[in-house]
Amino acid sequence: MTRRNLNGSRVLVTGGGSGIGRQMGVQAAERGAHVIIWDRDGKAGDRVRDEIRKAGGSAESHTVDITDVAGVNAAAKASGAVDVVINNAGIVAGKHLLDSTEDSIRRTYEVNALGLYWVTRAVLPGMIERGDGSVVTIASAAGLLGVAQQTDYSATKFAAVGFMESLRAEMRALGRPIDVLTVCPFFIDTGMFEGAQTKFPLLLPVLKEGPVANEVLNAIERRKPTLLLPPFARVLPLARLLPVRIFDRLADFLGVNQTMDHFVGRAGTKG
């Protein structure tokens, strides 16, 4: 299988106005892609668009709330052909279940889970018609392992992982040449998880957005189906095979359920 060349490709990034979304947009432009920024914060998206153009790249921006199906479809029509879509927009509340409000829980599901459907459904037909494309979702390590204070966030990321696994199976069953890449990173230092901590920073470090963005774009070009970051995160799927008591002890040793004890975070779109 030949590598995907981002040079000349049209790359759509949701939540592209900040954080890792911004980084992926900027770096994709540096690789020669035309970058399409979607963000609910239109001014943030415009700033990234202007940043890319100032550096000599090609970009456009659209104000889009991915929970609004009609708005997503209109933005997809305005954006034109998309070769690579990166489902990056997301939110986190970081509260215990009984402290979470109904509105917060509902909004987390609408953005993190349902938004994947609306965006992917809007751009996938064009990819299939052209006989090529790449669907990428920035899920989370919390989509592989349930974490305290993330009952809503973790559940939506499990949904994202399942969505992408099913989409990949569907494309293969239908004989569609569409790449499907699921990215499951540990905490990324974007402000979204401000205050989150790790007990073993050498094994599970808080990741830097620039290197993560680079890894994601490399994985897209290599047509990889999955990307788990950091490398130690690759043991998480295997850990699920352990007996529950041993699994719980391992999680306790790694301090998994204490990572959110000092969480502050910020509301908004994830990069």
Q: Where is each model-derived feature located?
A:
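The beta1-alpha1 cofactor-binding region of Rossmann-like NAD(H)/NADP(H)-dependent oxidoreductases
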Residues: 42, 63-74, 102
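Residue(s) in the substrate-gating loop at a strand-loop-helix junction
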Residues: 140
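Substrate-binding pocket helix/loop in short-chain dehydrogenase/reductase
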Residues: 96-97, 101-106
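SDR active-site lid
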Residues: 170-233
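Conserved glycine-rich cofactor-binding loop
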Residues: 10, 17-18, 41
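Conserved NAD(P)H cofactor-binding loop of Rossmann-fold oxidoreductase domains
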Residues: 88-93
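Active-site helix of classical SDR
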Residues: 120, 156
